[in-house]
Every structure is written in structure tokens, then in C-alpha cells.
Amino acid sequence: MDLKEIALHLQDFRNVYVTGNPAMLRSRTDFLDIFSAYGLAADMSVSKRTGLLIVCSDPMQKKIDRAAALNIPIISEQQWFELMPELEALGMWNGKPIPFADDNGIYRFDVGGVG
């Protein structure tokens, strides 16, 4: 699936699972703010309800294997940030500013614009 197809898929399956440790965010909990802005929810496990698996550094291989067995789209953390404009184009972004953090502090990320 390309990013546009994944965005369409997330309109029906709004649960996302993150495995591993984010390199671009302070922690996996920072994904919660981002998911909220797109009407998505974090899954507690990989299941048939999961719409997307985001793979960060040092992921759990069994989560990747489970997602693959269930034909769940699997993308990297970098691809997630490339997917965000596709979600916005489908009207999934609620207009809420999305805070995200790195080791230098908290920044504002404006979807579709310059942060």
C-alpha cells in the first residue's frame, strides 16, 4: 500500500499500534497527541481492529509478524510523518495544533505548513 491507500484504510480502521522507541519524538506517548488530532486511537495490542503498525527503533518482531499475518499496513516512524498530510487531505485532521518533542524541547508542528 502506498501512503494514500494507507490514509484511506485509516478512515475505516482508526486504531494504530506503535512498536519500538521513537527516534523523532520524546516517547511513544507523544504519538497520543498526534493520533488525537486525527481522530485515531492507540491500540493496546495488534489485532484485526488495528489499522496501522508504526515501527520505531528496536521494535518487537512478534508485533511486526502479527501485523503482517493480519495484513495490517506497516510503516516506519518517518513514513508516519509523511502520511500526516495525506490524512489532512482526507479531512481527518481536526485543526488542533500538534505538539511534539525531541531532545531539545517541545515544538509546534503545523500540518501542511512550516513548523
Model-found features: residue ranges?
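DNA strand-break repair and replication-stress modules
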Residues: M1-G115
